[in-house]
Amino acid sequence: MSGAIGPIIGQNYGAGHFDRVRRAYIDGLIYVLVYVLVVWTILFFIRDMLVDAFSATGEGAELVRLFCAVIAGSFVFVGTLFVSNAAFNTLGYPFISTVFNWGRATLGTVPFVWFGSLWLGVPGVLWGQAAGSILFGAAAAIVGYRLVTHLHRRPPGEPPVPIWRIALSPFSTGKSLTGI
């Protein structure tokens, strides 16, 4: 999904169809929601079959059941993050994409998993991972929605103001690094 939504957003942005950019972003989020709900529903109903298929017992069986019944739903927010990052990258905001990706992978994972494990043991690891994904996915969706609803203020052709400049080595234009 994240590889497919970027070109659609980019083409409509380049053509100045800001309403279509917003619609593509929202449709991408809806697609992620529906897809995860379908898979989550399937996992919910086959969770005991999966436990049997993996010959899981005890705590392992309970973890599989927890994931299939509850935690799998948090992947809506992982997908939301992917769609939002594709939009950020396509619209010229790769730094925002990087912040959200790095944030979820570090700040949205390590402390949540650590505290989750302290409070709930092994299931807390899954709960912590889900909590971090929900936090960063929801934040990315909010920022992404605000971005696509305010595109008309910055027409195509005007690149966003860079947050920093990459130091260029001698004999280099830096185009391979920045794409500019």
What do the PLM-derived regions correspond to, one by one?
Residues 1-41, 45, 78-100:
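Small-residue-rich hydrophobic transmembrane alpha-helices
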Residues 9, 50-51, 88, 115-116, ...:
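Hydrophobic alpha-helical interface/terminus motif in multipass membrane transporters
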Residues 29, 34-42, 107-112, 135-142:
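Transmembrane-helix signature of multi-pass solute transporters
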Residues 32, 68-71, 75, 101-102, ...:
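Residue-level recognition of transmembrane alpha-helices
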Residues 38-61, 65:
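Short membrane-interface helical motifs at transmembrane helix boundaries
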Residues 58-84:
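Alpha-helical transmembrane segments of multi-pass membrane proteins
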Residues 62, 105-138, 148:
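Membrane-interface helix-loop junctions in multi-pass transport and translocation proteins
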Residues 115, 130-180:
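C-terminal transmembrane helix end/exit motif
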